[in-house]
């Protein structure tokens, strides 16, 4: 990894609160050594883990999840995602985190500033590449910070409408 940002330990309480309030949601918890812990797995979780072939430890409580956590990936059926996002964004402590949908059924919770835009900027700085010479391609909400920062931004025709609506994005 170029760098890694971890969720503060208080995030465990926040994650447990989401799982308790929204029983249709599950969460995968990612660690810096690529370990994954899954809490309250649902069909979306199982499909995601099957696609990624990621070894996962299934747990019954956040107390079983070691720290540090680099990302919490909530999963729910697409029709429930708006309720999940609304719940997350309405919590008073959640302004301390990045909350973004990465697909129609997945929502990422990461440390504030831990997003694709920040990482592309940091990589460009380390490599001495000027912003106007950085090209990025993205199609979903978790790509918006990266596309906003890039000197040249592109998206496929089937990208989310809010991605295609970005003024600097060129449609592929």
Where are the regions a protein language model picked out?
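Acidic, Mg2+-coordinating phosphoryl-transfer loop and its flanking beta/alpha structural elements
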Residues: 120, 130-172
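Generic low-polarity alpha-helical segments
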Residues: 7, 15, 46-47, 168-171
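Conserved acidic, metal-coordinating active-site core of Asp-based
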Residues: 14, 18-137, 158
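Flexible, active-site-adjacent loop/turn segments at secondary-structure boundaries
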Residues: 5, 104-107, 170
């Amino acid at each position: 990894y170029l760098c890694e940002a971890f969720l503060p330990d208080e995030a465990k309480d926040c994650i447990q609160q989401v799982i308790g309030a929204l029983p249709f949601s599950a969460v995968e918890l990612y660690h810096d050594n690529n370990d994954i812990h899954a809490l309250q797995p649902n069909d979306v979780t199982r499909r995601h883990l099957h696609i990624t072939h990621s070894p996962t430890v299934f747990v019954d409580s956040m107390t079983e999840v070691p720290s540090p956590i680099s990302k919490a990936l909530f999963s729910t059926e697409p029709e429930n995602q708006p309720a999940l996002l609304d719940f997350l964004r309405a919590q008073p402590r959640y302004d301390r985190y990045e909350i973004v949908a990465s697909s129609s059924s997945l929502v990422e919770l990461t440390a504030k500033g831990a997003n694709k835009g920040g990482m592309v900027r940091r990589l460009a700085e380390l490599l001495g590449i000027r912003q106007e010479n950085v090209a990025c391609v993205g199609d979903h909400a978790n790509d918006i910070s990266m596309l906003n920062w890039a000197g040249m931004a592109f998206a496929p025709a089937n990208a989310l409408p809010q991605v295609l609506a970005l003024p600097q994005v060129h449609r592929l």
